[in-house]
Amino acid sequence: MTTYETTARAAVPGATASAPAAPLRTRTHTWEPRPASVPGLAEMSGLEILRAALEGTLPAASMTSTLGFRLTEVGEGRAVFEGDPGDHLLNPMGTVHGGFLATLLDSALGSAVMTRLPAGTTYTTVQLGVHMIRPVLADTPALRCEGTALHVGRTTATAEARVIGTHDGKLYAHATTTCAVLRLT
């Protein structure tokens, strides 16, 4: 859960009557921490883990609360996230920072790979290639990011993902990844 609060700003250096300083904003969020050792987690496949997170029986990754996105769909070789841009994600030019899109893409890519991993294995991203197509503004409605696993082998995996505007159907960014597949035991 994320909440926003706007408060009046005291005198700010550089603010003038014709260009007053904007009010300060505060953003807070809460998340359920995932215990370091979840009983039975090592016996679950990647798809089972993601389905449990989607259903709420396992906590979602804390990164999703931090940046304002969520897992919305998961299936064999596929994961979908939706993210909400906002003015808390702006870069110095006033558009949403590319790191938001890169993180959204990396989450969908890795989760798509994870859906194809058996129990006792995990993955880590070793390469991420992101292509930004158009800028995202603070008032851009939700973005949908769908990741698809292309290859999942014993030691490596690859996937691709796209970020599409839910309001306009336009492509905002796309990416590919290579992941290392790791045995936990």
Regions found by a protein language model. Give the residues of each.
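Terminal targeting signals and extreme-terminal segments of soluble enzymes
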Residues: 1-185
